[in-house]
UniProtKB/Swiss-Prot annotation:
InterPro entries cross-referenced by the UniProt entry: Cu-R_B_prcur
Subcellular location: Cell outer membrane
Keyword Membrane assigned: yes
Gene name of this polypeptide: pcoB
Protein name in UniProt: Copper resistance protein B
Signal peptide: 1-23
Organism: Escherichia coli
Keyword NADP assigned: no
Length: 296
C-alpha cells in the first residue's frame, strides 16, 4: 500500500508533461492542414492588370476658362440705387438731452439743452439750443444751426451760425468746429465762434456714459468757455471765463425716456469772476439737479 502511494505523484507528473506536449503540437500545427484551398485562389495578376488600365482622374478643365472682364463684372453686379443698398436714407433724431430743474442758493431755475439732426451718414443738418430761466425770466438762451460732414468714422466737421438771444441784446456768431467720439466713446466737441462785432470765443465740451447696469447710467460731463475780449454787457472777461462740471445719474424706464438726478459745480475765472462779484453774485456755485432725458 505504501509503495502504491509513492507512485501517485510520479503518475501525475507524467500525465501533466504529456498534456503539455500535446498542446504545443496542436499550436504549431497548420490549422488549415488537410484542406484543399486551390479552388479559393483569386486571379490576382488579372485583377491588378485591369485596375492599372483605368483612365486617370481629370483634375483640369479641357476647355480653357477665359479671364474675367469688366463687362462680366458689370453683368454679375448690377447698378443698385441708393435705396437698394440703404446708403442714402434720410434719418433724424430729436434729443432733449437736459430738461432739468436746478436748485442753488435758495433759487430755483429751469435749464434746457437740445440736440437734433436730420440727414444721412455723411451729411447732416444740426439744430442745437440751450438756455436757462429764473424767476419767470429767460436769463440765457442761444440756438445753433450747423451743417455737419463726416471726416472720419468717429468725427464730423461742423460749420454754421449761432444766435444769442439772452443775456443783453441779440448777437450773431459764425461757428466752425469738430464733434464726435474720442477714445473710449467719450463724446466731445470743440467749436470756435466769431461774432459780427469781431469778438471770438471757444467752447469745449464732453460727456461720457458709465453703464452701472443696462438701464442705470452715470454720466459725467464738462464745459469750458474762453473769450477773446471783455464783454461787460454779458458779464464775460477776456481769457478763461467759466467751467462747469456735472454728474448725472439716470434710469432708463424706456430707452426714449430717462429721469435723472445730479449735481454740477460752476466756477467763474479772472475778469468774469470780478464782474460777478461787483454785481453781488458768487463766482462759484454747487447746483442740485433733477430732470429727464427724452429722445424720439
Amino acid at each position: 500500500m505504501k509503495r502504491n502511494l509513492k507512485a501517485i505523484p510520479v503518475l501525475v507528473a507524467g500525465l501533466f508533461t504529456s498534456q503539455l506536449s500535446i498542446a504545443a503540437g496542436s499550436v504549431s500545427a497548420d490549422p488549415h492542414a488537410g484542406h484543399d484551398m486551390s479552388a479559393m485562389q483569386m486571379p490576382a495578376d488579372e485583377n491588378f492588370t485591369e485596375m492599372t488600365s483605368m483612365e486617370p482622374i481629370v483634375t483640369e478643365s479641357r476647355t480653357p476658362i477665359p479671364p474675367v472682364t469688366d463687362a462680366d463684372r458689370k453683368a454679375a453686379f448690377g447698378n443698385l440705387q441708393g435705396h437698394a443698398i440703404h446708403d442714402s436714407a434720410i434719418n433724424y433724431l430729436v434729443l432733449l438731452d437736459q430738461l432739468e430743474w436746478q436748485r442753488s442758493d435758495n433759487t430755483n431755475n429751469f435749464s434746457w439743452s437740445v440736440n437734433s439732426w436730420i440727414g444721412g451718414d455723411t451729411d447732416r443738418i444740426w439744430l442745437k439750443s440751450e438756455g436757462e430761466r429764473s424767476n419767470g425770466e429767460t436769463e440765457a438762451a442761444e440756438a445753433q444751426l450747423l451743417w455737419g460732414h463726416a471726416v472720419g468714422p468717429w468725427w464730423d466737421l461742423v460749420a454754421g451760425v449761432r444766435q444769442d438771444f439772452r443775456p443783453a441784446s441779440a448777437r450773431t456768431w459764425a461757428a466752425v468746429g469738430f464733434q464726435g467720439l474720442a477714445l473710449y466713446n467719450f463724446e466731445s466737441e470743440i467749436t470756435g465762434f466769431v461774432s459780427n462785432g469781431g469778438k471770438a470765443a471757444l467752447r469745449l465740451g464732453g460727456e461720457y456714459d458709465v453703464l452701472l447696469t443696462n438701464r442705470l447710467i452715470l454720466q459725467p460731463s464738462y464745459e469750458v468757455n474762453f473769450y477773446s475780449q471783455d464783454d461787460e454787457s454779458r458779464g464775460r472777461g477776456r481769457g478763461l471765463t467759466d467751467t462747469e462740471l456735472g454728474l448725472r445719474l439716470r434710469y432708463e424706464i424706456r430707452r426714449e425716456f430717462a429721469p435723472y438726478i445730479g449735481v454740477s459745480w460752476n466756477q467763474l475765472y479772472g475778469k468774469t469772476s470780478d464782474m460777478a462779484k461787483r454785481e453781488g453774485e458768487k463766482d462759484h456755485q454747487v447746483v442740485f439737479l433733477a430732470g429727464a432725458r427724452i429722445w424720439f
